Regions:
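Conserved beta-strand-loop-alpha-helix junction that forms the acyl-donor binding cleft
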Residues: 130-140, 156-161
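Conserved acetyl-CoA-binding loop of GNAT-fold acetyltransferases
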Residues: 144-153
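Conserved GNAT acetyl-CoA-binding A-motif
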Residues: 120-131, 154
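Terminal substrate-recognition subdomain of acyl/acetyltransferases
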Residues: 2-4, 156-167
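Acetyl-CoA-dependent GNAT
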Residues: 6, 11, 15-95, 100-102, ...
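Structured loop/turn residues at beta-strand edges in well-structured enzyme cores
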Residues: 78, 123, 149
């Protein structure tokens, strides 16, 4: 009788390695550029300038910026996701979480968030906040599954130079 062997796939949530930081920063910056273009109607050039400025302001010492933490999610020995959060006074802010596109929709995002929330709980954190793009319905639904609730809305208005008076 033949038996079918199944390969056991292993997922690991771990601190990001130094050599992964630049790759993550490029991926994250590109995502932020797309977000700024879509949700703020920035030109690509303006979005790239803003994204670069934001990263330099938020992470002046890169991976060594105090109170900022970086994680990698591995699946079957391959890095498939990255996460950046800050933790201060037992309150966390999730600045970025991403899964490589070909690994989305397979339950890994759920496992990644669960591992992150368990880490925070084990460190005594009492809350976590985040911002999500309004057009990212998949992420909104996932966060709601974990009990996140909407606490406000970011709003913006582009002022056009040719408008001298707003009525």
């Amino acid at each position: 009788m033949k038996t079918k062997q199944s390969k056991i796939l292993k997922s690991i949530y771990r601190p990001m390695h130094c050599d992964e930081f630049d790759l993550w920063a490029d991926l994250s910056s590109n995502d932020y550029v797309e977000d700024l273009m879509t949700n703020h109607r920035y030109s690509r050039k303006k979005a790239q300038v803003e994204a670069s400025k934001s990263f330099k302001t938020a992470l002046p010492a890169g991976m060594l910026t105090p109170n900022n933490h970086f994680r990698t999610y591995e699946h079957d020995s391959q890095a498939v996701g990255y996460l950046w959060f800050s933790l201060e006074d037992n309150s966390a802010f999730l600045s970025d979480i991403m899964l490589i596109p070909e690994f989305q929709g397979k339950g890994m995002g759920r496992d990644f968030i669960r591992a992150f929330l368990n880490e925070l709980a084990s460190q005594g954190a009492f809350e976590v906040e985040l911002r999500v793009s309004p057009d990212n319905q998949r992420a909104l639904n996932l966060y709601k599954e974990f009990g996140f609730r909407i606490t406000g809305f970011d709003m913006s208005l582009l002022l056009e130079p040719e408008l001298s008076v707003i009525r």
